[in-house]
Amino acid sequence: MKVAVASRNPNKVRAVEEAYRLFGIPARVSSVDKPPSLPPQPVGLEAVVAGAVERAKAALAAAGEAEHGVGIEAGALEAGGRHLDVTVAAVADRGGLVTLGFGPAFQIPDVFLGDVLRGVELGVLAERHFGKAAVGYREGIIGLLTRGRVTRLDLNVVAVAMALVPRLPANAQLYRFWKTAP
């Protein structure tokens, strides 16, 4: 299966490869540019989901041979009076079906929160604070906060895997859209 991901970030490309492999789905993953209209730091659950969906549809449109387009978006949401960083993945197909998955979320450090809510990318803030370049292309802020025990790749893989769950053949009877999905 040919799969396109709307990101040039090797971390996201690898996450898509690993998620498909997890379910035994042979996939050749290519990367395309993300849509230019996306904000650097989406705030609010609907904005994060919309970003993932927009990326997935853009990937499918940009890679004419792809059967699936994948979008991975991380952003801030409020829950329980706290602000969390969550990763959302969307998988779109040529039949128009879009499925969603979420990765684990973690509480955004207080020292970054004000800037994040103003739209500054969390990865940029982490780079400045920790003095490391290209954090989002490597371990992510979660990797820095957990001293490498949990990485951005881990969050991305889980999000994409969860977006694939409704598409697994074993789940065909559980989802109403299955008969119309390729």
From Swiss-Prot:
Give the EC number(s) under which this enzyme is classified: 3.6.1.73
Pfam families attached here? NTPase_I-T (PF01931)
List, in alphabetical order, the Gene Ontology terms for molecular function in this entry: ITPase activity; metal ion binding; nucleotide binding; ribonucleoside triphosphate phosphatase activity
Q: Where does Mg(2+) bind?
A: E65
**UniProt keyword list:** Hydrolase, Magnesium, Manganese, Metal-binding, Nucleotide metabolism, Nucleotide-binding
Cofactor entry: Mg(2+); Mn(2+)
Q: Which InterPro entries match?
A: ITPase-like_fam (IPR029001), Non_canon_purine_NTPase (IPR002786), NTPase/PRRC1 (IPR026533), YjjX_NTPase (IPR050299)
Reactions catalysed: XTP + H2O = XDP + phosphate + H(+); ITP + H2O = IDP + phosphate + H(+)
Q: Where does substrate bind?
A: E65, A66
Name of the molecule in the record = Probable inosine/xanthosine triphosphatase
Organism this protein belongs to: Pyrobaculum neutrophilum (strain DSM 2338 / JCM 9278 / NBRC 100436 / V24Sta) (Thermoproteus neutrophilus)
